[in-house]
């Protein structure tokens, strides 16, 4: 059995066990509620509403409240110097279709809804990154730190010596050119 539901001004075809992304709904995470705006129910027999099917309802569970990937909005008018750049993230709600009921018949899902708290997942990942950084810093012993510092100093000294050599060469060649000019003027 399937149903066509309307939410947020859009229509979605759903079956029991489907996961659907709809525009943001003001429902708590893990909340179970019914959608009564059913436009059509199909399957063994089809019922089309005018505009809604009476007695039909779809039971859903909120599994995620999040934002979509960042979309780039770029506007330009050529030869006018007009350029606008913006980004946008659309909020959405992910729904798990638990059951579709109509005319005494009910199509239920065998699966259970898995609720994902996006904020908690992000916080866990951030904590894991911080812990990994601390562990890496703790694993570096004082000997490694000293070696690294010594390498930096050695590189700097080598670089200073190379710079001094190039400066000396440049001044010698410059002095030779000046001397050559003076001798050519005298002659």
Swiss-Prot record:
Single annotated GO MF: rRNA binding
Pfam families membership: Ribosomal_L21p (PF00829)
GO BP of this protein: translation
The organism's place on the tree of life at top rank: Bacteria
Ranges for region Disordered: 157-187
Key words of the record: Ribonucleoprotein, Ribosomal protein, RNA-binding, rRNA-binding
InterPro entries: bL21-like, bL21-like_sf, Ribosomal_bL21
Keyword Manganese appears in the UniProt entry: no
Keyword hit for Ribonucleoprotein: yes
GO cellular component annotations of the record: cytoplasm; ribonucleoprotein complex; ribosome
Family listed: Belongs to the bacterial ribosomal protein bL21 family.
The protein's assembly and partners: Part of the 50S ribosomal subunit. Contacts protein L20.
Function noted in UniProt: This protein binds to 23S rRNA in the presence of protein L20.
Protein's name according to its UniProt entry: Large ribosomal subunit protein bL21
Organism for this UniProt entry: Bdellovibrio bacteriovorus (strain ATCC 15356 / DSM 50701 / NCIMB 9529 / HD100)
Gene behind this protein: rplU
